[in-house]
């Protein structure tokens, strides 16, 4: 069979023979993969259209060339990258029943998936800082968040995300995979590949956990801290109407923070405490955490942000 053939390749791994992995998609539901491809294709399509529309509106409307919308552009680009990193193998497995992936391609994919995941967290932290400056230091908003500063923040977010993920595929290349070569998902994830290793993979496992704590954990703490300071500043405003107006500028960001971090926490909890759960639950949680933000983020900003909503309506000639 295809699986046994690939397992032999892995067992006989040498310097001249690259391991090949099998992407299982939804184990036990292979007979409905073609049907499952429909909602996933729709989700990808919505993500591409939504984020591309937000980017187009921000880039073409000069009135939106402000720090808040520049950071929103970064978020939309990150969401597009996250979608593109999983799309090729997801469609190959569900639509074409092509499940084989070479180790080098798998390592490249997991590099991009995890890079864009950490980049999303970094951009959300930068957006929280933007809201903090706008509400707590409104008179200095444009002098603090200049175009130069925003560019440097964006570059720092990208370099940080790439830097912490880069050792992951490099470490994986040194491990020998002697177990069955089937991966649990329709794409490659670090922990999933790590399970196949029969050599000491503790260093890579500990490093992966450390990176998650140092990025997602630290970012979430600073985002929470920024909103504590924002709330303190808002409560100091005398006018109730002005309080609501100030908080309203943060609602969209708070929504996308929850859309990102709640599934991440859910995946972590299921992975750690849900050993008895069906593998399908684990797979669905991973799919949700990678697909939900790219699909919902542009919807949230289109509904909650008047300038974006009006820009979209104008672009399509509705008003």
Which residues make up each language-model segment?
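Transmembrane helical core of 7TM receptor-like proteins
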Residues: 1-319
């Amino acid at each position: 069979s295809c699986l046994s053939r690939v397992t032999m390749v892995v067992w006989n791994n040498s310097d001249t023979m690259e391991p090949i992995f099998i992407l299982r998609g939804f184990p036990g539901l292979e007979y409905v993969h073609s049907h499952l491809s429909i909602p996933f294709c729709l989700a990808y399509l919505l993500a591409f259209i939504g984020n591309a529309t937000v980017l187009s509106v921000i880039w073409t409307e000069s009135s939106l060339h402000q720090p808040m919308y520049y950071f929103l552009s970064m978020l939309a680009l990150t969401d597009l990258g996250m979608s593109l990193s999983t799309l090729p193998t997801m469609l190959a497995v569900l639509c074409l029943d092509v499940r084989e992936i070479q180790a080098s391609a798998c390592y490249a994919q997991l590099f991009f998936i995890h890079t864009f995941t950490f980049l999303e967290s970094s951009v959300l932290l930068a957006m929280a800082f933007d809201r903090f400056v706008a509400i707590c230091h409104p008179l200095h908003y444009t002098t603090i968040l200049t175009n130069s500063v925003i560019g440097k923040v964006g570059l720092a977010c990208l370099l940080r995300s790439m830097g912490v993920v880069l050792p992951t595929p490099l470490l994986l290349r040194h491990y020998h995979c002697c177990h069955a070569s089937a991966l649990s998902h329709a794409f490659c994830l670090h922990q999933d590949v790590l399970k196949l290793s029969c050599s000491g993979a503790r260093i890579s496992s500990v490093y992966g956990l450390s990176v998650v704590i140092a990025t997602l954990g630290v970012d979430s703490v600073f985002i929470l801290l920024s909103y504590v300071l924002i709330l303190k500043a808002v409560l100091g405003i005398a006018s109730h109407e002005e309080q609501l107006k100030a908080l309203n500028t943060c609602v969209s960001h708070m929504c996308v923070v929850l859309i990102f971090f709640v599934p991440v926490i859910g995946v972590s909890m299921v992975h750690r405490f849900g050993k008895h759960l069906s593998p399908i639950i684990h797979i669905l949680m991973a799919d949700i955490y990678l697909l939900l933000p790219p699909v919902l983020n542009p919807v949230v900003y289109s509904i909650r942000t008047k300038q974006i909503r009006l820009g979209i309506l104008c672009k399509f000639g509705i008003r």
